């Protein structure tokens, strides 16, 4: 069996959805579940962990986690009442898919969900995200090291 590579993907997304009845827990569960399903449909891969975290001024937080395309998301915490915007940190660990494919899946899925709800989502990549590619027996170009 060929070894599956891991190219971790991390991004910060700013979500804004109009209205006062945004159910972030179910919306973000749907988002992560769709990411997992689309990753699974994109080729031979193993979903390690897809997780998202949003923190709020009242010291609250919302954490969503998915470990397989066919298992419902785990939810911890909740968004404050009448919350229409949030910053979401998303981490996607999927073995066997190129980072660019994962990035495309997350961006397209977020855009679809926001558009369906007449909202918007903008994303900011973490600096140096492309420096963290994990391929066995390949050189890490940012450090000149072999993994």
Spell out what each predicted region is.
Residues 1-147:
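P-loop NTP-binding site
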């Amino acid at each position: 069996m060929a070894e599956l590579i891991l190219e971790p993907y991390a991004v910060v997304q700013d979500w804004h959805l109009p209205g006062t009845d945004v159910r972030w827990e179910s919306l973000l569960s749907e988002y992560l579940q769709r990411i997992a399903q689309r990753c699974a449909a994109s080729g031979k891969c193993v979903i390690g962990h897809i997780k998202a975290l949003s923190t709020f001024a009242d010291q609250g937080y919302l954490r969503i986690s998915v470990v397989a395309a066919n298992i419902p998301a785990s939810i911890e915490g909740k968004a404050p009442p009448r919350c229409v915007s949030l910053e979401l940190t998303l981490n996607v660990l999927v073995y066997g898919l190129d980072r660019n494919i994962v990035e495309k899946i997350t961006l397209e899925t977020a855009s679809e969900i926001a558009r369906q709800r007449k909202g918007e989502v903008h994303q900011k990549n973490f600096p140096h995200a492309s420096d963290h590619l994990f391929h066995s027996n390949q050189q890490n170009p940012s450090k000149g090291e072999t993994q």
